[in-house]
Amino acid sequence: HTRLVSDWSSDVCSSDLFVDPQKDGGRMNEAAQDPLVERITIDGQQYLRYLPLPVDVALLKGSTADEDGNISLEEEPANLDIYAMAAAAHNSGGKVIFQVRRKVPRGKLSARSVRIPSAIVDVVVVDPDQRQSYEIVYDPSISGEQRDDQLSLEAPDFSLRLAIARRAKTELREGDVINFGFGIPDQIASMLAAEGTDERYYQTIEHGTYGGKLLTGTLFGYARNPSCMIDAPSQFDFYSGGGLDTAFLGFGQIDQEGNVNVSKLDGVTVGPGGFIDIAQNARKVVFCGTFDAKGAKFETGHGQLSITRPGQIRKFVEKVDQITFSGKQARFQNQQVLYVTERAVFRLQEKELELMEIAPGIDLQKDILDQMDFLPLIPENLKTMDASIFMDDQNG
């Protein structure tokens, strides 16, 4: 079993993962020949070390610059890895270029407000009309400068994606430190915000945000009324050290060993983002997604689910195209792993996947087993998912 280290994080990883040099080494096709990662041994244990990449130019956005080039981020929706990128470019002999909204005289920025020192900034461009994000001009409740105590969010409309999120939400425990991934998992955050129960948990996003009303869609990674903002590399240090109780993440493919692929789908490179760091280090991982994809048709009513047409693309396959989450490593670390779909819930067992629950109205053979490339374990006491999950008048 292998761990992964870089200049700022160490993550529990397995040689099964596509980033291991004995597998793909993070390379996406045969044309990519340069080594990106190597195996090293520390205290008798194997790690994966990502090789440093020289950065020629870093184009970054801040809020305010003083005459010396010190940069503050008070209006930004997240700290992200802005400092790390600037430092990497500077230390590589590259250029660091910042766009800011305003420029102030020397000494007007307090030392505590400066997030990027002038020593590593080469160029400052002032744009008084810069937007907070491409969708929002400026919202001080997102940057954490002000609280919006009148904020109210509506529960998302019913859909099968919401039904999946409802079932996944039942895995929460009060006081958990949690992470929500993009897509179906972020609907869990929307439900918690609409219910007013979000403060029962410590919600985090890998961009560095803690607490608040997590935003979804194109604004994923931001929050209104956040309680804390740290740099993304520090957030991943926390994740890699085992700080997450539960992570809710999406999936593209799942195989019989519990491996998950999100990084290469139908031959198209999507990339893992922070998925590996989060999934392989959380104590509990709840994968959320539709059972199949492309063209599936459903009917719901009276707490029942009916599949009128299966999807054209199977997600439960004999072998995933690329391993972004290792079931083998999860077993080694005693992680609790669930796979939640609209029609079935699985869990990772000692050697394979076990079917835990099926949706009311679903035919086990026709709607589940015939739509999979492998046969999961099926317990004698197979349970039925709560019918309320499929009620379109339920708010959470």
Which residues are covered by each model-predicted region?
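Conserved phosphate- and dinucleotide-binding cores of soluble alpha/beta proteins
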Residues: 3, 7-149, 216-395
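N-terminal active-site beta-alpha-beta segment that forms phosphate/nucleotide-binding
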Residues: 145-231
